[in-house]
Each structure stands twice: as C-alpha cells, then as structure tokens.
Design a protein with these regions (language model features):
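Nucleotide phosphate-binding/pyrophosphate-handling subdomain across enzymes
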Residues: 1-80
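C-terminal helical cap/extension that packs against the catalytic core
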Residues: 27-29, 68-130
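Active-site-proximal loop/hinge segments that shape catalytic or ion-binding/gating pockets
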Residues: 136
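Short, active-site-adjacent cap segments at secondary-structure transitions
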Residues: 139-141
Length: 164
C-alpha cells in the first residue's frame, strides 16, 4: 500500500452522521456531536463555511452528556433552536432540555418527536438557510433513516476532509 493510496482513501472517506449533508436548499446536515470537543469543531465548521447564513438547529441529547456546555457553544450562534428528544430511554426530554438551555438560545421551540422537529426546521427555513441536527448519534440515526426513506441519498458535506 502506497502513501498515495492511503491519502486517496482518507480524502474520499465518508463518515455517516458526521457533517453529513442531506440536501442543498436549504442545506440540511446531520452531525452526531455529543460532547464539547465536537461542539467546538461544529462551531468552527459554521464559522469557516457558513458566514452569515441563518442556522436552524435541531438538538436532542442523552442525560449523561454535557448539555449545558454544548448548548453554551452552539445555541448563541443558531438563529433558532428546535429542542427534541431521541427515542431512547437515556434521552433528556425536550421540555427539560428547554428548561436547561433556553437562556442560551435567541429563539427556541419544543418539538418532542424528532421527525416533527426536523419538519418544523424545514418549514421555518428559507432556501439559503442551513439546518443542523445534532446532539446525539441516536437522534442522527433516527433522522438519517427517515430521510433515506423520504428524500434523496445523502452527500458528503466537505469532500476530502474528515471531521473528528
């Protein structure tokens, strides 16, 4: 195996659920960020790639995650946050998430069902906006499965780059 073939493999690698772009207009991304380090990377992606684009954030998390720190990093940059809950016993309910994190958000909504939360974001979005669903790999998995049944196949967000 040559260095070139290794570099080529890395450049074309895709990691489902990690900055995975599902559509263009509006841009819809799935990102399994569930810890502060991942939130910082997602925030860097926003700063480097989105400029002043409006961001709608669909967020759901597990009880054992650093929700307060993640929300403190991501929510202030999002124009609207839609709080939801993955269908897992360890998930924080959307209403409790709201109590914990509303002070970080410019605007927030509670939509407990993840599929309805994504639909709400799509209804709120203009073609130029970016929607990100994040906070839990379980949430990303649910939305990815639903999107695959309802929409087009996903495309990589950033060709040739691995994130995390």
């Amino acid at each position: 195996m040559t260095d070139e073939s290794i570099a080529s493999g890395i450049a074309t690698a895709q990691w489902p659920g990690r900055l995975e772009r599902l559509s263009e207009s509006p841009a819809v991304y799935l990102d399994g960020t569930h810890n502060p380090a991942g939130a910082r990377e997602l925030l860097s992606f926003w700063e480097e790639n989105l400029g002043d684009r409006r961001i709608l954030l669909v967020y759901g998390a597990m009880r054992d995650k650093a929700v307060d720190e993640i929300a403190g990093l991501l929510f202030p940059r999002a124009d609207a946050v839609i709080l939801t809950q993955p269908r897992q016993p360890r998930a924080v309910s959307a209403s409790i998430l709201a109590e914990m994190t509303n002070h970080f958000a410019k605007s927030s909504f509670v939509v407990s069902d993840p599929l309805e939360a994504l639909d709400r974001a799509l209804q709120m979005a203009s073609p130029e906006d970016a929607i990100f669903a994040t906070g839990s790999l379980y949430l990303v998995g649910e939305l990815r499965a639903h999107w695959g049944q309802q929409k087009q196949a996903p495309t990589p967000a950033v060709s040739g780059q691995l994130h995390r």
